[in-house]
Amino acid sequence: MLVLGLETSCDETGVALYDSERGLLADALFSQIDLHRAYGGVVPELASRDHVKRMLPLIRQVLAEADCVPTEIDAIAYTAGPGLVGALLVGASCAQALAFAWGIPALGVHHMEGHLLAPMLEEQPPQFPFVALLVSGGHTQLVRVDGIGQYELLGETLDDAAGEAFDKTAKMIGLNYPGGPEIARLATQGVAGRFVFPRPMTDRPGLDFSFSGLKTFALNTWQQCVSAGDDGEQTRCDISLAFQQAVVETLTIKCKRALKQTGLKRLVIAGGVSANKALRASLEKMLAEMKGNVFYARPEFCTDNGAMIAFAGCQRLQAGQQESLAISVQARWPMEQLSAL
């Protein structure tokens, strides 16, 4: 089965072609980072307009790269949520229109299920069951995964997502958007131990997260440094390191608890923050000590992309899942509501 995947949940326009027998044939991505940088974050209306501008050229690019014509495509998968409604509607409308014109089915895919399954595009994919850490700008969740659509939520953030906390903290100390990569970059030049930030909710049982207090702690630390006239580049580096260490250690502690609670030895990390090198190193060390394995997607498939949507859609379409031509998207969509295959 040959599936065209379309991703437009936020500020990246992603298109890909995935074949159930040959694997990923082509993928293309346009990031809107430069467009939103001047505003310090994503502007929904601008995101939607840019998706409209980029979608068809990217589809043509992917078809040309794969040497494919529309008559060869068996189905279209598109991100139906969660995400920005206007942005989602661009992808959904395009998918349904093309599906109607080409006489093929279109299927809405859950954005986070796409992220969760992205490591399966690698040469050594994880086997079910496993624990997944979904960590991005909008989500921080621990999920037990027994199969596609068989998801048990173990814990989630009670306020800010980890990626959101990265971006907001970066903005508070004067770094550019997107803040996560900027903090990671400065952290490599930080002096360890100058600042020590708390590891939120690790002193109590449970698998939930909270990052709003950590963000406030970072802000107070920065304001104290500014008041003392110590607001130079090295202080930004030191705060970045302390903040990143706190987030990474918190996520690692919670992942270890989840693995012990479930008795599993396989961990998948997915979502934009999973590209963070410090997080990967920490989880790899923890899994090595537990004699387990950690899996993640290649860096370009950690952030939003069309390949993960094409793959996830292909799995569901092959299992017989169908959808009407109605255009329906959801800004909020709990993954536990998905049907099992």
From Swiss-Prot:
Keyword Acyltransferase among UniProt keywords: yes
Keyword annotations of the record: Acyltransferase, Cytoplasm, Iron, Metal-binding, Transferase, tRNA processing
EC number: 2.3.1.234
Top-level enzyme category: transferase
Biological process according to GO: tRNA threonylcarbamoyladenosine modification
Record's subcellular location: Cytoplasm
Coiled-coil annotated residue ranges, if any: none
Protein name: tRNA N6-adenosine threonylcarbamoyltransferase
Gene for this chain: tsaD
